Amino acid sequence: MSLQKSKTRFGAVVMKRWSRKLNRIIARTAAVFLAFLAIFAYNTNNAKAESVNVSAASAIVLEASTGRVLYEKNAYEKMPMASTTKVMTALVALDYGNLNDVVTVSKNASGVEGSSIWLSAGEKMTLSDMLYGLMLASGNDAAVAIAEHVGGSLDGFVELMNKKAQEIGAYNTHFANPNGLPAEGHYTTAFDLALICARAMQNENFCEIVKTQYKTLPWEGHEWDRVVKNKNKILWNYEGGNGIKTGYTKEAGKCLTAAAQRDSMQLVSVVLSAPDMFNDCMALMDYGFENYKNRVIMEAGEYIGDVTVEDGTEDRFSVYTDKDIMYPLTDTEYEQIKRRVHLEEKVKAPVSMGQLVGTIDLWLGENRLYSVELKAAYQIGKNSYEFNLNRLLKFWMNGRMLDM
């Protein structure tokens, strides 16, 4: 063997030994915060069997951010929903329309029966103002004008409504019009409608509209403006009330979707065919706030474990959570939360940013609440001769400087 080859081989052995030592030193301080994705399946099995005194034929209250059902009564029975339909009308309009668009009222829209904001054929109004007229005063004329503008036609808009219902998971809902007037094939369930409302309450523009008590709207051809008042008494009469929509037809009876937020918990309640609809929704939300709290079941910065890296520029990295996970629980349930961690013991370099390295499942009894994906927050490269040489030189230089 030549002298040059011998030196090269000796250098490689030294590099490898020093590299292992350096990897161990560096790994003691290397910590990777992992991005995680919480996958939540709607859980309706834990709704309390206790009775809440409501007049409604169908009722439900759920926590909006998780979709957890806190109480329900006949919540999966298909029923007409009157003007609570307009929650979906507004949501679709916000998804597909532009708030600054100018809507021209058709003769068809101006002639719709029932509650209205007194639109005239040919009148022009921004989509934003039209939505206030829809959700505060429950204008059937506004519903048709919005639908024709955003969907191109009533049929086109209704198709978008039904598509959105499927996206949300409201599988037992079907719309036949944008205003909720009686029609064949127009129905929902209290559960589905609560899901729709929960989704709508995630939209900032929607929330701003439905929490408004009074709104002044322009009125073409008149010396004064329209002033519309929100029909939802929850805004005045219930602590934290912040939405959302009333409804009534002879066929559907009195219907109400109501929302309230206290601290970090946003509740949505729905009652269908409810003679005492406001008191019903307040009783449902009272039950939710009195029995449940939105609790942190996994905190940001919690240490989960270590993952070994084979042939990497680092020997291992530590796994931490990077955000809080909250869930509505009773005091008793909070003590029953269990975790099941599934973490890779070893991964081979290179490690890509976002690479899946494990999961955490959070359980309440036999119900899995969340499955959290643990992903590498940054890249870890593959070991190489050049990398080891550079690290050895830096380590050697640092050592010499300390000796000086």
Q: What is each stretch, according to the model?
A:
Residues A170-Y171, P182-Y187, F191-M404:
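Domain-terminus/edge residues, biased toward the C-terminal soluble/receptor-binding domains
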Residues M1-N23:
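N-terminal secretory signal peptides that target proteins for export/translocation
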Residues N23-N46:
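Sec-dependent N-terminal signal peptides of Gram-positive bacterial secreted proteins and lipoproteins
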Residues V13, S19-L22, A35, A47, ...:
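A generic local structural motif
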Residues K21, I25-A31, N53, A57, ...:
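Generic hydrophobic-segment detector
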Residues L3-K5, K16, A41-E204, E208-I209, ...:
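Active-site-adjacent loops and short helices of periplasmic peptidoglycan-processing enzymes
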Residues M1, R20, R24, T44-A47, ...:
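Short linear motifs in intrinsically disordered/low-complexity regions
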Residues W18-I26, L127, Y385:
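Structural motif marking the loop-to-transmembrane transition
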